[in-house]
């Protein structure tokens, strides 16, 4: 958010620019007390994105976010959980797997490309259907 404010202040974002924030499904999905602070920060990021999108749409500066749920990364594989816990977590996803890093990249590339020229203020949820339940 601070970087975006500085870019705007210094007029470094030209017309026809696109800004994509990497947020989280936690910002739009039910949370537990274990990750409430994380969810609040992601909800705040999404609110900032929508406000910036509305404020700068007339200059054709687009703001969007990619909101992934669990992504299969090295960091995720280093979390010490049992196979039973992992299976219980995966059971929450209608598509029975975690996301892949390249799926986040593809959504981001789309939002930065001309293919999404009419897209602003949008959160793309990459969550295997998690937020449907």
Q: What feature does the model see in each segment?
A:
Residues 28, 67-78:
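Short, flexible catalytic-loop segment of classical short-chain dehydrogenase/reductase
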Residues 4, 41, 49:
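Active-site helix of classical SDR
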Residues 9, 54-55, 117:
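Alpha-helical segment proximal to the catalytic Tyr-Lys
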Residues 57, 62, 119-121:
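Short, small/polar-rich loop/turn modules that mediate ligand/substrate recognition or access, typified
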Residues 93-104:
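A conserved structural motif in NAD(P)-dependent oxidoreductases
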Residues 24:
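Residue(s) in the substrate-gating loop at a strand-loop-helix junction
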Residues 30-39, 51:
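Active-site loop-to-helix junction immediately N-terminal to the catalytic Tyr of the SDR YXXXK motif
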